[in-house]
């Protein structure tokens, strides 16, 4: 690294633009969470082994996770290393669908201006685990809200958003638009679905409008007929069409299900669920003999399609699945087993024993001393996967016909297979010397994750749930979690047991930054009022205030400590950064800028400090005299919200901006080397692993992404090469080179 004096002489206050066009894509290694706001965005692959879902501008094709035995902790999230990430969109994905046999995936996006592409991906014949882009359909502007494949995989229907307001039918194999038509006036369209027995007829529905579209291949014309709903005015959010194309089920925002008889295009029945659910019907999926309804309140409702009352639908049960709305429901296409009949215990081998078992089973069910799921017919049992708006993935079992009662039902319990943070993440942190796990904080929740598998190992929820965790960090023992809250308290927890160790009440108006001093002896914290305070910790159970320092006039956004803990740096919204003498409890130097400083980091060499803020400038400072070493401007018109410097070499600088992308800079060159794909929501925190091989990003939707650091990967490869050469030449000495943990090296993910 160049010295501070050399850097000042060469680049002092000389703004320069980084070369964004030459940057490569930052390789995504793994991710937790998905874009739950995309309607019907979660899909099961027809092979029954994989799932397909959107994550920002990326499509993830990953193995199905296995259920956990704990409500809050997932055991086996699936083999994340074998997940495939499909990149190609310039904006956030807003619609996703998969064809019946899994050959094609179609995805669409939202862009701020210009053409919103629809991309068709085809399964790679040579590598079945991945897809490749085969068609890019570019006719819609700004936004695409819904997509649907025909049953034979030959046709694709797409619906544009409010600024586009067009319905277009495509030929999947040639990529040409067969025909397009404006959306009928009277409301926006939210959903589309093809009829099962036709590749030229589909249904669209939305705000006060339901239309049946037909494509005339002879005249090359797309025409529509409005379905007669009588006097009903409903905002329709979801569509499901039965196997015989007789009925279309339309889920509404008013918790009603409209049943349309398709041959005559008339409303047959209106089935209300207002007594059981709230916030509308967000998703509908057909299952054998039943209709599954996902509601905005997070509940799953089972309706029988074999009603005995003469009606088309009959209410069976309603189960709470998630804390947020169910936007996707996917049902396994095959039952859990092809062996029909009641599953008997191993001891029931004779007909008498089986009849006796059935008799006592029915008696237990009638007296409520047993649950229906204790008696199973696996040939009638299907797995139902529910995706929520907050990115949770849950599984529940559906029985199409119970072997004793003959009714359809939902089995207990609900298995939470995978979950994002659950609330918007405000902070992410690694232990000082251990990259095996990390912690996130946001809302009333704190989670500790395993880095390799991205599985949640522990969860802490603070009451009341209206509280918000604003900052989080590990103390130097790597076991104690420090958290700052909007009620003005500092709370410390044991990482393993989640036990509350100590609380500093009234520490600040709102605790916005917190760090632990060496040896778990103290804590330094910053608040929304601008005070910096030092705390003494005794035996990890008592905390007392030692000093309070006031230099900032506004919120302190970040605190960074030097290695000896005798100096600290703070960044504030008042446009100043202050270097503090912790021993003397006094300011050493300060540097000012016309910005809100949002983030800072100290280079491992401790001769430079890097700051970023709302003025889009990245600034290198000398902590000795607060002089500017280098300033660069981000070329995009977006505020900088988070940064971190890789350790231990300090070769890479990660910057997160309000455009929802992370840019990786070479520290010495100040050039952008890699840039991430777009996140589904705003990025709130970035953190390098202690070994510098991974970069973690967290966002406001609760998702976490793990990126490989290419600079560190290539450095390890170079070190291995040098080691190999010295072995061959006989010059190898174990004391000459640092050891390289080859097994822990991050491998760049295979391109889609």
Name each model-derived stretch.
Residues 55, 108-114, 159-163, 205-207, ...:
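Conserved strand-to-loop turn within each blade of WD40 beta-propeller repeats
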Residues 35, 680-682, 690, 702-752:
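Terminal intrinsically disordered, low-complexity extensions flanking WD-repeat/beta-propeller proteins
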Residues 21-37, 78-83, 131, 410-414:
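A short helix->beta-strand "capping" segment at the edge of beta-propeller domains
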Residues 60-61, 119, 166-168, 211, ...:
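WD40 beta-propeller blade core
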Residues 33-36, 87-93, 138-144, 182-189, ...:
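WD40/WD-repeat beta-propeller blade N-cap
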Residues 51, 105, 156, 201-202, ...:
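Hydrophobic beta-strand positions that form the internal "hydrophobic ladder"
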Residues 43-47, 98-102, 148-153, 193-199, ...:
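Loop/turn segments within WD40 beta-propeller blades
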Residues 65, 123-126, 172-175, 216-218, ...:
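Short loop/turn segments that connect beta-strands within beta-propeller blades
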């Amino acid at each position: 690294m160049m010295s501070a004096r050399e850097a000042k002489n060469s680049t002092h206050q000389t703004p320069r633009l980084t070369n964004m066009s030459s940057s490569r894509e930052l390789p995504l290694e793994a991710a937790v969470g998905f874009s739950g706001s995309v309607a019907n965005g979660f899909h099961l692959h027809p092979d029954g082994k994989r799932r397909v879902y959107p994550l920002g501008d990326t499509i993830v094709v990953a193995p199905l996770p296995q259920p956990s035995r704990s409500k809050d902790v997932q055991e086996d999230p699936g083999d994340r290393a074998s997940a495939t990430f499909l990149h190609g969109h310039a904006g956030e994905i807003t619609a996703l669908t998969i064809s019946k046999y899994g050959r094609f995936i179609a995805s669409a996006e939202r862009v701020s201006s210009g053409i919103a592409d629809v991309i068709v991906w085809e399964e790679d014949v040579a590598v079945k685990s991945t897809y490749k882009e085969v068609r890019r359909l570019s006719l819609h502007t700004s936004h695409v809200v819904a997509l649907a494949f025909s049953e034979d995989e030959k046709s694709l229907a797409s619906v544009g958003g409010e600024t586009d307001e067009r319905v277009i039918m495509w030929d999947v194999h040639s990529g040409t638009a067969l025909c397009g038509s404006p959306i009928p006036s009277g409301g926006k369209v939210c959903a589309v679905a093809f009829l099962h027995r036709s590749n030229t007829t589909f249904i669209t529905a939305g705000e006060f409008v339901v239309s049946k579209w037909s494509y005339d291949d002879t005249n090359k014309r797309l025409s529509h007929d409005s379905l007669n709903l009588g006097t009903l005015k409903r905002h329709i959010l979801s569509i499901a069409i039965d196997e015989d194309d007789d009925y279309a089920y339309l889920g509404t925002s008013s918790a009603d299900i409209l049943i349309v008889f398709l041959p005559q295009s008339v409303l047959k029945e209106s089935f209300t669920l207002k007594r059981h659910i709230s916030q509308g019907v967000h998703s509908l999926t057909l299952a054998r003999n039943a209709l599954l309804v996902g509601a905005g309140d997070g509940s799953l409702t089972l309706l029988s399609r074999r009603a005995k009352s003469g009606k088309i639908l009959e209410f069976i049960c309603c189960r709470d699945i998630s804390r947020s709305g169910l936007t996707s429901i996917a049902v396994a296409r095959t039952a859990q087993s092809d062996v029909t009949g009641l599953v008997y215990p191993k001891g029931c081998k004779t007909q008498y024993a089986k009849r006796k078992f059935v008799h006592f089973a029915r008696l237990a069910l009638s007296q409520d001393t047993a649950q229906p799921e204790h008696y199973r017919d696996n040939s009638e049992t299907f797995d139902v996967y529910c995706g929520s708006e907050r990115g949770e993935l849950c599984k529940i079992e559906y029985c199409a016909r119970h072997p004793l009662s003959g009714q359809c039902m939902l089995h207990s319990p609900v298995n939470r297979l995978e979950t994002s943070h659950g609330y918007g993440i405000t902070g992410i942190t690694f232990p000082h010397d251990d990259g095996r796990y990390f912690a996130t904080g946001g809302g009333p929740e704190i989670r500790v994750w395993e880095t390799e598998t991205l599985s949640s190992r522990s969860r802490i929820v603070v009451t009341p749930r209206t509280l918000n965790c604003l900052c989080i960090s590990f103390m130097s023992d790597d076991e104690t979690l420090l958290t700052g809250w909007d009620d003005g308290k500092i709370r410390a927890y044991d990482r393993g047991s989640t036990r509350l160790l100590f609380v500093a009440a009234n520490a600040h108006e709102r605790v916005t930054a917190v760090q632990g001093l060496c040896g778990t002896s103290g804590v330094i914290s910053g608040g929304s009022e601008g005070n910096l305070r030092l705390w003494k910790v005794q035996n990890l159970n008592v905390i007392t205030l030692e000093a309070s320092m006031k230099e900032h006039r506004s919120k302190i956004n970040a605190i960074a400590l030097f290695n000896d803990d005798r100096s600290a740096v703070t960044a504030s919204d008042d446009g100043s950064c202050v270097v503090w003498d912790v021993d003397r409890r006094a300011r050493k130097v300060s540097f000012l800028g016309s910005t809100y400083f949002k983030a800072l980091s100290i280079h491992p060499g401790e001769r430079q400090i890097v700051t970023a803020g709302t003025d889009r400038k990245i600034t290198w400072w000398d902590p000795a005299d607060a002089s500017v070493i280098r300033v660069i401007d981000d070329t995009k018109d977006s505020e900088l919200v988070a940064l971190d410097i890789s350790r231990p070499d300090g070769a890479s600088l990660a910057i997160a901006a309000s455009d929802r992308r992370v840019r990786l800079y070479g520290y010495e060159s100040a050039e952008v080397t890699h840039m991430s794909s777009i996140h589904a929501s705003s990025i709130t925190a970035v953190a390098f692993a202690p070994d510098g091989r991974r970069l973690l990003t967290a966002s406001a939707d609760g998702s976490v992404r793990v990126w490989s650091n290419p600079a560190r990967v290539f450095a390890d490869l170079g070190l291995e090469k040098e080691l190999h050469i010295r072995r061959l030449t006989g010059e190898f000495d174990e004391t000459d080179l640092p050891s390289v943990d080859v097994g822990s090296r991050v491998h760049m993910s295979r391109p889609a």
